[in-house]
Every structure is written in structure tokens, then in C-alpha cells.
């Protein structure tokens, strides 16, 4: 069966459904990498700027959307900045298991389904639950790459179902200057 559109799962309804030991057939998390670029702390000390993609509304982001956004940002940064000139981290993990009560809509389907009887649904995917102000992507870089980082995060935001903003800061322990772009 095809994947349902994101609008079916964007809003949070009910408690999180995360206990894998009780869920038979829960899908695996299909995000292979959460840290990209320069991952060693010693090499990251040379980066003086920080960019964050921050979500503005409460909701759920499916793992397919997170992976599409990650690939979009990673490919753009690898091509235009180079893997040795940035650090990118995906901060959220899709722990919540989505359920789907599959309904068939074809001739003879009434013999195959139960309607709303036993309508709890079977596992159909995973999603990350996010709150306003939560960081989705975190990037460290040098000041000369600020335009490419902003473009990569903008492209990643286009794959997400919730409104986001890009926050750019200087990387120091005291907070520093903050620049926000919607």
C-alpha cells in the first residue's frame, strides 16, 4: 500500500506509542546517519559559527521527511562547502510508532476488512514528536560558508511538514550574537 500523505500524521493525537517490546512489527528507524561532515571535537573547534533549524509549531515529523531533509542538506553541503568544512547533526529521533487502520476501497473489499471493528491499527511508520523551539538540525561552520549553510537548511526545511526558522549564532560559551531568519 502507498504511504499516506503527511497531513494524516502531522498533528499529535494521544500519548506517544514507543515501547518496541510490546509492538510486534514496528518498523526500523531508516535514518542511517545523524552526524555528518567533521565529527571529531578537536577538528570542530575551528568552527566559529552555529546554525540551527528550529521548529515553530508542535507536531510530528515522519521518518521519511527527516531522511529527505537530511539528504537534501547533506548533498548540498558536500557539493558546495566540502565535507571537511562543516558539521551537521540531525537532533531528533523518530521514536513514536505510527499506526494505520487500512481500509480497502475496491470491489469485494467488504469481504476482506472489518470496518471499525478492532480499529487500533497496525504499525505503519515512525515519527519524531517535536515542540515549539526544538532544534531539528544543528550545524557548525566557518563564517565564509554562511550563505551555503543557510541555503542547505532552507532546502531541508522545505521537506518538513511544520513551519521552521533558521537561527545563526556565533559559537562561544556566553551566547553571543543571534541572527534569525524565517
Swiss-Prot record:
GO cellular component: ribonucleoprotein complex; ribosome
Classification via InterPro entries: Ribosomal_uL16 (IPR047873), Ribosomal_uL16_arc (IPR022981), Ribosomal_uL16_CS_euk_arc (IPR018255), Ribosomal_uL16_dom (IPR016180), Ribosomal_uL16_euk_arch (IPR001197), Ribosomal_uL16_sf (IPR036920)
Keyword Ribosomal protein: yes
Pfam family, one: Ribosomal_L16
Domain of life: Archaea
Xref: NCBIfam families: PRK04199.1-1 (NF003236), PRK04199.1-4 (NF003239)
Name of the protein described by the UniProt record: Large ribosomal subunit protein uL16
Organism: Pyrobaculum islandicum (strain DSM 4184 / JCM 9189 / GEO3)
Gene responsible for this protein: rpl10e
Amino acid at each position: 500500500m502507498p504511504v499516506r500523505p503527511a497531513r494524516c500524521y502531522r498533528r499529535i493525537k494521544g500519548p506517544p506509542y514507543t515501547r518496541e517490546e510490546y509492538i510486534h512489527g514496528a518498523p526500523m528507524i531508516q535514518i542511517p546517519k545523524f552526524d555528518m561532515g567533521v565529527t571529531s571535537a578537536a577538528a570542530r573547534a575551528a568552527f566559529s559559527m552555529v546554525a540551527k533549524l528550529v521548529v515553530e509549531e508542535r507536531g510530528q515529523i515522519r521518518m521519511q521527511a527527516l531522511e529527505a531533509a537530511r539528504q537534501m542538506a547533506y548533498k548540498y553541503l558536500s557539493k558546495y562547502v566540502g565535507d571537511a568544512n562543516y558539521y551537521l547533526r540531525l537532533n531528533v529521533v523518530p521514536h513514536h510508532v505510527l499506526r494505520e487502520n487500512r481500509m480497502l476501497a475496491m470491489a469485494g473489499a467488504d469481504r476482506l476488512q472489518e470496518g471499525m471493528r478492532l480499529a487500533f491499527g497496525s504499525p505503519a511508520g515512525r515519527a519524531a514528536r517535536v515542540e515549539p523551539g526544538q532544534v531539528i538540525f544543528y550545524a557548525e561552520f566557518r563564517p565564509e560558508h554562511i550563505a551555503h549553510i543557510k541555503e542547505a537548511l532552507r532546502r531541508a526545511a522545505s521537506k518538513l511538514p511544520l513551519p521552521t526558522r533558521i537561527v545563526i549564532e556565533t559559537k562561544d560559551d556566553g551566547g553571543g550574537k543571534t541572527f534569525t531568519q524565517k
